[in-house]
């Protein structure tokens, strides 16, 4: 798309970053100054009744800056990147029609990618093919299937661990159904986002500082009643660890503790470690992201001013 035709598109802002990097605080500050409306880009914040462990904006913050796409699913329900793209596009169109600018804030990089580039045309799951793969795994082991994937799609095999049956099974399933590799299909994008997007990523300059923040925030969540929040979910009886909601960082570890699998101290240790790993994955995504303007979360006023400098012209 030419620069001229791109300039005629409606404007949007992406504010991305790892967990515990200060995205929400900056988004709220920006809303005071720019004509923006916030859309949450977070696969955990979509769930009702999961507030403390997801660091969902509190009532005061939501009053100052309402977020769209919060609390839109029960924890028993699934929600895909395709669902997000559909919902986000509808919200963006609504915001643009009102003469304002969508500010998308969050850390679920897959959602940002799906929104920006469109979704690759992957085939739907096929229960028969999946059953055949699982049968083969039961007979030969997942290591054997991983070797098979290495021959079919070495790029995907390098990214998928042999102990990750869900992703391994999906990569093989895609090939058996379509005759094309997962790598081949994911390089084929769908419809690109029809907006002129200004992209920002916020993070502390040092990894140690981020790790420190993550640990502090996990302990803060525990002090705020995180255990009671998960106990209420645990007591429902219809939720389990195969659901995306319960696999969320922190919830999975607390679930293991409540189920008597690990001690409280082990839960805290694993919860902090899992959150650090999540942040590492988010930063890895962002380092390979094109056209992103980096902000230092330890200098919030400077970060705000940098955003205003880049997008200030669109506020008029």
Curated annotation (Swiss-Prot):
Q: Residues that bind ATP, according to the entry?
A: 17-24
The reaction(s) catalysed by this protein are: adenosine(37) in tRNA + dimethylallyl diphosphate = N(6)-dimethylallyladenosine(37) in tRNA + diphosphate
- The residues that hold substrate are 19-24
Instruction: Region Interaction with substrate tRNA: list its residue ranges.
Output: 42-45, 166-170, 247-252, 280-287
Instruction: Quote the SUPFAM superfamilies the UniProt record gives.
Output: P-loop containing nucleoside triphosphate hydrolases
Q: Name one Pfam family in it.
A: IPPT
Alphabetically ordered keywords of this record: ATP-binding, Magnesium, Nucleotide-binding, Transferase, tRNA processing
| Residues annotated as transmembrane | none
Is the Nucleotide-binding keyword given for this protein? yes
Enumerate the cofactors the protein uses: Mg(2+)
* PANTHER family linked: TRNA DIMETHYLALLYLTRANSFERASE
The similarity comment for this entry is:
Belongs to the IPP transferase family.
Q: What is this protein called?
A: tRNA dimethylallyltransferase
Species this protein is from: Escherichia coli O157:H7
Provide the taxonomic classification. Answer: Bacteria, Pseudomonadati, Pseudomonadota, Gammaproteobacteria, Enterobacterales
Q: What's the name of its gene?
A: miaA
